[in-house]
Amino acid sequence: MRLVQLSRHSIAFPSPEGALREPNGLLALGGDLSPARLLMAYQHGIFPWFSPGDPILWWSPDPRAVLWPEKFHLSRSMKRFHNASPYRVTLNYAFDRVIDGCANHRDEGTWITRGIEEAYRRLHELGHAHSIEVWRDRELVGGMYGVSQGALFCGESMFSRQENASKTALLVFCAEFTRHGGKLIDCQVLNSHTASLGAIEIPRRDYLDHLAALRQQPLASRFWVPRTLFLPRK
């Protein structure tokens, strides 16, 4: 296994199976963040992740963190909060503000560089990247964004400025995504936050098999039309 240097003249990627074991999943470096290359990456279970000043690094970790949306873990406290929630949730209303929120809301620094922001804004303009917004009155208090691959959604980042705002974004999106045929959410690497919401780890090979099948199952185009999302109170 060796780290592959990508060419700017080809958007091809090496097989994810050739990724390094340490650091886990590092596959390649270089290339660019053009829409064509980013889409090629997501189609093959690969994503960019690098710090400011570093070369572009491409990853496909093993195991892979995923969330089956119908298995979102709704804790008792979160259920009580949601039933009296002061929030309103929307889809694709404010992509630029959501990615800004994700970039600026990490105390330890951010991997969302200016180049990353510009690249994903372009994907959004092309209809491939999407945002979920959480509002309190007219204030944006949380949200998340990611890239659609048919019935699979690749979550990229989320942020929260008020209590349970990012959890609310994921909860409401999971319900809406499931109702319209969505099957799986890619969480990339498991952390305590996503694990508490029901994310699990599966072998990379299994993730790639799910991706190959689900990306061939497009949701209705109207699913991504900007609108308010609702989740019935229980």
Curated annotation (Swiss-Prot):
The keyword Cytoplasm applies. Keywords: Acyltransferase, Cytoplasm, Transferase. GO terms for cellular component: cytoplasm. It is found in: Cytoplasm. It catalyses: N-terminal L-lysyl-[protein] + L-leucyl-tRNA(Leu) = N-terminal L-leucyl-L-lysyl-[protein] + tRNA(Leu) + H(+); N-terminal L-arginyl-[protein] + L-leucyl-tRNA(Leu) = N-terminal L-leucyl-L-arginyl-[protein] + tRNA(Leu) + H(+); L-phenylalanyl-tRNA(Phe) + an N-terminal L-alpha-aminoacyl-[protein] = an N-terminal L-phenylalanyl-L-alpha-aminoacyl-[protein] + tRNA(Phe). The keyword Acyltransferase applies. Its EC number is 2.3.2.6. GO terms for biological process: protein catabolic process. Belongs to the L/F-transferase family. PANTHER family: LEUCYL/PHENYLALANYL-TRNA--PROTEIN TRANSFERASE, LEUCYL_PHENYLALANYL-TRNA--PROTEIN TRANSFERASE. This is Leucyl/phenylalanyl-tRNA--protein transferase. It comes from Salmonella typhimurium (strain LT2 / SGSC1412 / ATCC 700720). The gene is aat.
